[in-house]
Amino acid sequence: MPQHAMGDTHFLSLPKHLFTSTSSATDSGCDTPPSSRASPASLRSAHGTLGSSSQPLFEPQAEKRSSQTAREVQYVSSGPQNSLCGWQAFTPKCLQVFNTPKGFLFFLCAASFLQGMTVNGFINTVITSIERRFDLHSYQSGLIASSYDIAACLCLTFVSYFGGNGHKPRWLGWGVLVLGIGSLVFALPHFTAGRYEVEMDEGLGTGTCLTNQSHVECKDSASGLSNYRLIFMLGQLLHGVGATPLYTLGVTYLDENVKSSYSPIYIAIFYTAAILGPAAGYLIGGAMLNVYTEVGQRTELTTDSPLWVGAWWIGFLGTGIAAFLIAIPILGYPRQLPGSQRYVVMRAAETQQLKDHSRGAVSNPAFGKTVRDLPLSIWLLLRNPTFILLCLAGATEATLIAGMSTFGPKFFEAQFSLSASEAATLFGYLVVPAGGGGTLLGGFLVNKFKLRGSGIIRFCLFCTLTSLLAFFVFLMHCPNVHMAGVTTGYVGSLLPKGQLDLKAACNAIYCCQPKHYSPLCGSDGTMYYSPCYAGCPADAETDLGGQKVYRGCSCILEKASSGWGNATAGKCASTCQSKPFLLVLVFVVIIFTFLSSIPALTATLRCVSDRQRSFALGIQWIVVRTLGSIPGPIAFGWVIDKACLLWQDQCGHQGSCFVYENEAMSRYMLIAGLTFKVLGFLFFVAAYFLYKSPSVSSDGLEASLPSQSSASDSPTEQLQSNV
């Protein structure tokens, strides 16, 4: 900390700030006592004429004293502002107990929890079911997931720039309402697409083939279900518009209304709620997938069947209604919480050193009020190399998070031979402690060790390097379950990669339709495409567990005894020995990826000026979404499609993928993960070396600030600190 010797006393060197504050709440509500209001005459006598502006004023002034600069901070309280909690004139005193940072944090966490549960939980959980129900490819479902970020990018500049200088809680409340509308739109295809009907392959039957059967069924099945992806994209676009204020205006509103040392904790709690939302979405969504999509209708399908489609739409109806309920209290919060402006100078003291012309522009009280200042605001951020590098680092992390969160359940489903609901639930069990715990722990560590600027970036470097090393877990993979005609021949020989041969001597005389995909596990440990391709009779028994059992299947070699083989409907269980180790390292990747999220966000807030924080977060989210969240699901979906072995045949057109090659899927995940992790590490390294620490520390300044009550009630106060 720079010190200036003036006799036996050392003064803290600070820029001179003149700023105003709203009045604090009294015990009986948010009303300001008349005695605490400073008259204009008293202000003029104490400090001279300050003008009528009620906004924070930043007027750097230099005064030479014995060849040294002694600069002081003056605190000036403004006239009363409306800081009551309520709606228009309806501001009952019973509501003022919530008019605190903690009260606002509660409702903001509820909104972020709901957004995370909907966008990053339910959608990622049901994506496989939607592909199945509406005949979509993975890249098409990836485009649905990316539509959220596309809408956010289109709105971020407008929302962060004008919302940053406007009434933030109102922007947030209306955003949550739009989010709820998007959820209702997303559930709409279930009610307009008609009933989900599946033709089951029950076995050989009579064994007769109808020559015109395929043509008739193809003609009748041309329903254009894949066009419903446009409705899903519209719902996601509304989700993106509604969620845009949450992670820009919501974060800066918290940062503006709490002490700077507590800001990482508040933001970490907020982001932890946003992480726990997807976790709850995975768990609740997984449970909903165990309910048949046509609720109340009986079906012979089981949850283990690849043709099973769960009730994917129920969660979106619930979140749509909940969003309307959460938006109401958020709309009632004031522009500023009582006593918040006492933290302005503390935030300014922690800000990275800016160039003279940048500091002069943002110190103007009128800066950022009109659209004419928008080009200059963007230019000032583009000239900040630390900010740009942190944006690029965030984009690389967002690519992985978006891609893996969208297709993580599908990866588990393929590797461990699980049903869609089992895979979603397992992935949720990893996300709950790893994502939520990592986010909360990151903010706690920044506060615990008083990390500032360069120290925060060093911490991000450590987290990125650790998760990069853990990503080598994808060198491992679980072998594919042997599937006759797909991964292995009917006589046990291996098939050339990419070559399918479902016909064999044991089923050649029967009329087996490849569109009837209904896998079953034979007693020989091999999985078969359908009962017909396994040579099973039409009649099937039902065991005590409710599963269908086929006996006398001609293509299954019984190993325990001579005679015909048996088979059970559903996939064969995976015997992967490396499953526990793979899950542990995936947990490490997730926790260290999220461990750096709050520190990186805090570093972004500390490397730009106070007036540009909302706008800077908006620009950062544009970069993160444009380069990360939008291409992430699309790229990962395209990569996963490359690993497909068996496609659904929709009358000569590819439907969704039935079977993936596990080794190729792991290899592609490894290449993608290492590429983006290395880039992120390099961006953090460059940001560390280009970051310029502030010339004044905020540690000494914090002790010199008045208490919250005095900051709000005392009309005039000079702050000097001995060190």
Curated annotation (Swiss-Prot):
GO terms for cellular component: plasma membrane. GO terms for molecular function: organic anion transmembrane transporter activity; prostaglandin transmembrane transporter activity. GO terms for biological process: monoatomic ion transport; organic anion transport. Residues 23-64, 700-723 are annotated as: Disordered. Keywords: Cell membrane, Disulfide bond, Glycoprotein, Ion transport, Membrane, Phosphoprotein, Transmembrane, Transmembrane helix, Transport. Residues 1-102, 164-169, 256-274, 335-380, 447-450, 606-614, 692-723 are cytoplasmic. Residues 500-557 form the Kazal-like domain. Residues 33-46, 701-723 have a biased composition (Low complexity). Disulfide bonds join 506-536, 521-555. The chain crosses the membrane at residues 103-123, 143-163, 170-194, 225-255, 275-295, 310-334, 381-402, 423-446, 451-473, 583-605, 615-640, 674-691. Glycans are attached at residues 212, 566. Belongs to the organo anion transporter (TC 2.A.60) family. Organic anion antiporter with apparent broad substrate specificity. Recognizes various substrates including thyroid hormones 3,3',5-triiodo-L-thyronine (T3), L-thyroxine (T4) and 3,3',5'-triiodo-L-thyronine (rT3), conjugated steroids such as estrone 3-sulfate and estradiol 17-beta glucuronide, bile acids such as taurocholate and prostanoids such as prostaglandin E2, likely operating in a tissue-specific manner. May be involved in uptake of metabolites from the circulation into organs such as kidney, liver or placenta. A conserved histidine residue in the third TMD (His-190) may play an essential role in the pH sensitivity of SLCO4A1/OATP4A1-mediated substrate transport. This is Solute carrier organic anion transporter family member 4A1. It comes from Mus musculus.
